[in-house]
Amino acid sequence: MIEDTMTLLSLLGRIMRYFLLRPETLFLLCISLALWSYFFHTDEVKTIVKSSRDAVKMVKGKVAEIMQNDRLGGLDVLEAEFSKTWEFKSHNVAVYSIQGRRDHMEDRFEVLTDLANKTHPSIFGIFDGHGGETAAEYVKSRLPEALKQHLQDYEKDKENSVLTYQTILEQQILSIDREMLEKLTVSYDEAGTTCLIALLSDKDLTVANVGDSRGVLCDKDGNAIPLSHDHKPYQLKERKRIKRAGGFISFNGSWRVQGILAMSRSLGDYPLKNLNVVIPDPDILTFDLDKLQPEFMILASDGLWDAFSNEEAVRFIKERLDEPHFGAKSIVLQSFYRGCPDNITVMVVKFRNSSKTEEH
């Protein structure tokens, strides 16, 4: 009896293997189940299919909108990807800043104005940190306020002062670097930052730059006028200075001082400062506003300039000055959309002679 039972079970097992579990049989079984589900549960299946189709259409529509919309109104769908955003708006100046694809936000910016009393020129600053946010935050929180105090003192007795906007800028930038280096060295913090500062008075625009943040101005004819020049290791002047100091530059994705830093001047960076291969000395330029009759200026971290040329950025903003952020938000989003991996900060300042703006 037991032998007969075992024989029967063995036969059933062979039937299962050779007939029911054959690929053709399983395929027909799946088709049969699908047809049965459709005809006997029509409403549920049709709802699932319709929802899937609607979802696909929505995604395709959003992608097409992003690809075709030059003004980037449809890019709000991407904003969920930004871990953090910052923005600032005050009648003639707008700032938009995103952390973007980086794990940390190391960009900082500052705006200090006194349009009512005009006790000092307007102060605009961009600080792009590296190696952590310590240096950028330190400079942002101290340098603009220090400039404000010294500029107010200067304005009270300008006629008798031997100082100028240029000398005040240079003195305060170098002073903040020395002060910060003392603190960073004690804590072994190797952070550094760029420093782009613009002083805007009634007749002049004075711009100081350390590093590779950049300023560009749009003049009355729509031309892009550089307000600063990047400090890069591959530039002949910088390369010679680094070599004289006993340093070197090497290529690792970009030209770097001692194979480390992708700019030749910065604030902070105490290990490279100790070698004197990276310096904090600013380049300072002054522009005659009556001569240029500018419409606006752009101050930005290198996240923008990795995606836009000076001329392209000016054209882009010029077409969007009527937007709430004067085009700053749109150009930041466009830089992100073009694949920029960095933090991106853009400040747009409209001048008094530009449309819908009556004063600095």
UniProtKB/Swiss-Prot annotation:
Statement: the UniProt record of this protein carries the keyword Nucleotide-binding: no
Residue numbers binding Mn(2+) 1: 128-129
Cytoplasmic side: 43-360
PROSITE patterns documented for this protein: PPM_1 (PS01032), PPM_2 (PS51746)
Key words of the record: Hydrolase, Magnesium, Manganese, Membrane, Metal-binding, Protein phosphatase, Transmembrane, Transmembrane helix
One of the record's GO cellular component terms: membrane
Listed transmembrane segments: 26-42
All copies of domain PPM-type phosphatase, residue ranges: 92-351
One Gene Ontology molecular-function label: metal ion binding
Xref: SMART domains: PP2C_SIG, PP2Cc
Predominant location category: membrane
Disruption phenotype: Mice exhibit increased fat mass and higher plasma glucose levels compared to wild type mice. Male mice also exhibit a decrease in free fatty acids and higher blood pressure.
Annotated disulfide bonds: none
Extracellular topological segments: 1-25
Matches recorded under InterPro entries: PP2C, PP2C_BS, PPM-type-like_dom_sf, PPM-type_phosphatase-like_dom
Taxonomy, superkingdom: Eukaryota
Bilayer topology term: Single-pass type I membrane protein
Entry EC no(s): 3.1.3.16
GO biological process: cell surface receptor protein serine/threonine kinase signaling pathway; MAPK cascade
Keyword Repeat attached: no
A Pfam short name: PP2C
PANTHER family: PROTEIN PHOSPHATASE (PTHR47992)
Subunit structure comment from the entry: Interacts with MAP3K7/TAK1 and MAP3K5.
Function text: Acts as a suppressor of the SAPK signaling pathways by associating with and dephosphorylating MAP3K7/TAK1 and MAP3K5, and by attenuating the association between MAP3K7/TAK1 and MAP2K4 or MAP2K6.
Protein name (Swiss-Prot/TrEMBL): Protein phosphatase 1L
Source species: Mus musculus
